[in-house]
Regions:
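Bacterial N-terminal signal peptides that target proteins for export
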Residues: 2-12
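Conserved ATP-binding subdomain of kinase catalytic cores across diverse folds
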Residues: 89-230, 299-302, 318
């Protein structure tokens, strides 16, 4: 009883303080503390983020309703958007205020488990951009494995795989100090920043996965899991983009259906993940890169990102291939421990298949070429405090 009372007081006290605060006014445009163009060019790294909701009372009410819900899952009705002013300070002391929309982000209630009313956030800037990023997530660190997620994305980017910009950043939310993991969303801007032409972005469709047995869900075994295209506006550009999108979705859903029907378990090649070798145009370099991607994710404890409903892809319409995008790997690399539970969905027996063995050799080759000093400097810029010693 005493513990329950303390928990209620812990949640309600900061919320009551917020309710007494006067509502803010949304900034009507991007504003910065300088017009010096050199400052904008040199603003590479985020130093801190300050978020102020325009209607604090409504945010608190929505947060409390989501928190009180007996369901472990955060229901969609609590993911409504709120206006907010986001002030970002960069490493060169440039500071800008962005009018924005924010909402609660995440599937489960661990995304609400911080100092109330702080939650993991989905953010869209209504004016301006942060190094070409307009849409991004601000995760409560423990929901993404803290330093593990930052290290994993940095490593994959350094090895020339597609992975979102991710960093640890000090923050305040309605004057409450906190820390977030900043991670850009997989959007048009993400594709362009990786020097790729705009084309379909696909991901595992999770809309039906909540209606299955929890044990099957944990293993990624969902007969209803298919893929979907996330950049729908690109489809509407014309017949060419529509036909490319249809081709991409048809090919990828073939792989998802094969996986869901367990056909991949009996394939002669021993493939026990999504089989993406679907096109006649696939070359050896693509196969090598995909094998290496899988091997690295397994090695750094990020096999969660290989479960079909967690996967994201960029479709290359010229070669008709699916380039894997790292997302939500739930890595354990920093803690130097592995979870056998995480591997359950891909390990059927005590053997490694050909792809895993060959992919491991490719991964070792790439890691041996890594410039440790340059990579270490990048990790420090992302908010990690690692030593080379």
């Amino acid at each position: 009883m005493h513990n329950t009372l303390n928990k209620i007081q812990f949640i309600l006290f900061p919320l009551l303080v917020l309710i007494l605060i006067s509502p803010n006014v949304l900034a009507n445009k991007l504003s910065c503390n300088t017009n010096n163009i050199d400052k904008f060019i040199g603003a590479e790294n985020i130093k801190s983020i300050d978020i102020s909701t325009v209607k604090s009372k409504k945010w608190v009410k929505n947060y409390l309703n989501a928190y009180k819900e007996p369901n472990k899952i955060i229901l969609e009705k609590y993911k409504k958007k709120f206006l907010a002013n986001i002030s970002i300070r960069f490493n060169n002391d440039l500071e800008c205020i962005f009018p924005s929309k924010i909402r609660i982000n995440g599937d489960y209630k661990d995304h609400l488990e911080s100092t109330p009313p702080i939650a993991s956030l989905d953010v869209e800037l209504l004016a301006g951009n942060i190094n070409s990023t307009i849409k991004f997530k601000l995760f409560i660190p423990h929901t993404r494995g803290g330093e593990n997620e930052v290290f994993a994305t940095a490593l994959l980017k350094e090895l020339k795989f597609l992975a979102p910009k991710t960093l640890i950043v000090p923050a305040t939310f309605n004057d409450i100090k906190t820390t977030f993991i900043f991670q850009e969303k997989i959007t048009k801007e993400f594709i362009e920043s990786n020097h790729l032409r705009e084309a379909p972005i696909l991901e595992g469709d999770e809309r039906f996965r909540w209606n299955i047995d929890p044990n099957e869900r944990a293993l990624g075994l969902n007969p209803f899991t298919l893929a979907r295209i996330t950049n729908n506006k690109w489809i509407e550009k014309g017949y060419t983009s529509l036909n490319i999108s249809k081709d991409a979705l048809e090919q990828l859903n073939k792989a998802y259906l094969n996986y869901s029907s367990y056909q991949h378990f009996s394939n002669s090649n021993g493939e026990n993940l999504l089989n993406l070798k679907l096109s006649d145009f696939i070359n050896e370099n693509y196969i090598k890169k995909e094998r290496e991607f899988k091997a690295i994710l397994i090695a750094i404890g990020s096999s969660h990102g290989l479960i079909p409903h967690n996967r994201s892809f960029y479709y290359d319409p010229i070669y008709r291939t699916f380039n894997s995008i790292y997302y939500d790997g739930d890595s354990t690399v920093v803690n130097l421990k592995s979870s056998n539970r995480k591997l359950d969905f891909i390990k059927f027996g005590s053997y490694l298949n050909n792809d895993e063995i060959i992919g491991s050799s490719y991964a070792i080759e790439s890691l041996n070429k890594l410039n440790q000093k340059i990579f270490h400097k990048k990790l420090l810029d992302l908010g990690l405090k690692f030593s080379l010693e």
